[in-house]
Amino acid sequence: MDERRLKGKRRVQLGKYAAVRGRKEGRLPAVMYDHRGVSVPLELAQQDFDRLFRALTRSTVLSLELDGGEVFCVFVKDYQHNMVSDRVEHVDFYAVEESVPLRMRIRLQLCGSPEGVRYGARLEKGLSYIEVESLPRNLPDRVVLDISGLGAGDVRRVRDVPLPASVVVLSDPDAVIVALSSSASEAGSPAGARTG
């Protein structure tokens, strides 16, 4: 099975009792909503969803095959999580049209330890998400920004975010994502000498 593909079946029996029985048999109850507001009650294998769940973000696109036929492009819209069993007990999917661009907030993930921090500079965080527009299949789950080379006084803005050409950034390009404040100790450091 594709790593982002789920197989579901329409639920014939609805209600709390049917959902509880289904969970005992390893089936996860769910509902798929489309852009017209139409809802389809369905169920899928709990283990298949659990396998994907930890890596999902709000912008992760999944392929949902329904009744062995039509495949829908979906996002996880909402879910119910059981704190005792640490399992998802219900999922709401939102189906979108693959040919229509979507606006979506994408999480920013910073990686690396800024060089300037070793010399006393302070890391200041700004945006944690950016807004983009793209066809559903081109949307990234998250955006990784390497900040390991930052020195005191350096700033990374939205315009510095690496994104494919198929993704249009809607956020202010000058908005700050991360900055390193200057410090007295960095002024005489090698990192301080490189930054202007």
UniProtKB/Swiss-Prot annotation:
One of its GO terms (molecular function) is 5S rRNA binding. GO terms for biological process: translation. GO terms for cellular component: cytosolic large ribosomal subunit. Keywords: Ribonucleoprotein, Ribosomal protein, RNA-binding, rRNA-binding. The keyword rRNA processing does not apply. InterPro entries: Rbsml_bL25/Gln-tRNA_synth_N (IPR020056), Ribosomal_bL25/Gln-tRNA_synth (IPR011035), Ribosomal_bL25_b-dom (IPR020057), Ribosomal_bL25_C (IPR037121), Ribosomal_bL25_long (IPR001021), Ribosomal_L25_dom (IPR029751), Ribosomal_uL5_bac-type (IPR020930). NCBIfam families: bL25_bact_ctc, PRK05618.4-2. This is one of the proteins that binds to the 5S RNA in the ribosome where it forms part of the central protuberance. Part of the 50S ribosomal subunit; part of the 5S rRNA/L5/L18/L25 subcomplex. Contacts the 5S rRNA. Binds to the 5S rRNA independently of L5 and L18. Belongs to the bacterial ribosomal protein bL25 family. CTC subfamily. This is Large ribosomal subunit protein bL25. It comes from Treponema pallidum (strain Nichols). The lineage of its organism: Bacteria, Pseudomonadati, Spirochaetota, Spirochaetia, Spirochaetales.
